[in-house]
């Protein structure tokens, strides 16, 4: 006869679920409102979503205080793991989401924002990403990954452009393949160690001195491929330009930030112990992936004729940059990862939001792209403020001081040198120089060429709604004045990373 199992509510520590339950309950609340009052103005759903995210942010602040006083918090049969990595990444996820949602207050022709399902799916997606970063259990990571991914596929398809459904299908196909790779890699590690918890997997493999190195490499390759799809690492990046092009510019900017920080955290938890295992092949595989991703993405970005696709390849290169922090594997590099991505979030979301200002409802028959370089030619004459702000974001992405990403790149390359990866730091510097060309190319078009279409100015002014101006203004202020807070930000991030044992 089986003995009874006694589980106390205190041992479950259900408070660890609060940051995830808030967006889930909020999404269900929006659906219920729509059931009873289906003709509500979309601004109600925007305000509700912002309120829900604000409450979620407050809950994260409370979790940060508990972590600062008590250290890592475990809950729900030790499946939930609330440490510094989880808290910092959730701040980025929720913060970027709060910057994205007001963009829904735009013209009615972007009809996906008129549906309450859009906001409910968006909140479910956020909860999925929060689960991903708040556990070291491979099963729960997979559940969070699929929850977020399925919602994101639908959000892409809801955009009312011809390429949106194609983009959603491509993303779904690649996502399904990534899910298969993740499942197989997890299965290999479970077969080797009898556990699906990353901490236990590390303990067992270390105790066995990596005796089954062949199977370990198989598991690593499959998991790296899964992360490669989610992080757009070469050669798993092929979906990225097409999906970004088929999505709205704002959603593309959001996709370049939030899904990737979730994947970065899972990769950091998993590869941190593998890189320090002393098995040189594990390090070599990741090293090659980082260098190839940074370099090839920059080369492809150089030859793009569409600004949106250029920014898509640029995002791939930046993801390779940040993966270098995981390869280096020191507290300084892991702190640099968060610093870099926080600063990148302001700059890249601002860049894609500027593309949204230049959007057109109906493209001319001869025009295949809504964001060709020619469209930005002479922008300083038709809309000088828009040209100046776009130039600001391009200079930051290029790493030009004193703008935001300069500090992220410097701190990351410094961590590479300190960690003994001097050659990698040189490769990163070289790639930054290459990237500078295609960022400055757009600035040249805006400031040194004559307008191809003389009346483009009315397009910018018509599209620049107050919410869009506000978000771009916040992004621009963060990009310009990052140097004021960068030292305090490094100290804050390092404290949380160090106290998490990374």
Curated annotation (Swiss-Prot):
For this UniProt record, the keywords arranged alphabetically read as follows: Cell inner membrane, Cell membrane, Membrane, NAD, Quinone, Translocase, Transmembrane, Transmembrane helix, Transport, Ubiquinone
InterPro entries xrefs:
NADH-Q_OxRdtase_suN/2, ND/Mrp_TM
E.C. numbers: 7.1.1.-
* Transmembrane helix is among the record's keywords: yes
* Catalytic reaction annotation: a quinone + NADH + 5 H(+)(in) = a quinol + NAD(+) + 4 H(+)(out)
Q: What is its main location?
A: membrane
- List where the protein spans the membrane: 16-36, 47-67, 85-105, 113-133, 138-158, 172-192, 213-233, 248-268, 273-293, 310-330, 337-357, 387-407, 410-430, 470-490
Function, as annotated, reads: NDH-1 shuttles electrons from NADH, via FMN and iron-sulfur (Fe-S) centers, to quinones in the respiratory chain. The immediate electron acceptor for the enzyme in this species is believed to be ubiquinone. Couples the redox reaction to proton translocation (for every two electrons transferred, four hydrogen ions are translocated across the cytoplasmic membrane), and thus conserves the redox energy in a proton gradient.
- Which PANTHER family does its entry note? NADH DEHYDROGENASE
Assembly information from the UniProt record: NDH-1 is composed of 14 different subunits. Subunits NuoA, H, J, K, L, M, N constitute the membrane sector of the complex.
Full protein name = NADH-quinone oxidoreductase subunit N
- Identify the species of origin: Sulfurimonas denitrificans (strain ATCC 33889 / DSM 1251) (Thiomicrospira denitrificans (strain ATCC 33889 / DSM 1251))
Gene name, Swiss-Prot/TrEMBL = nuoN
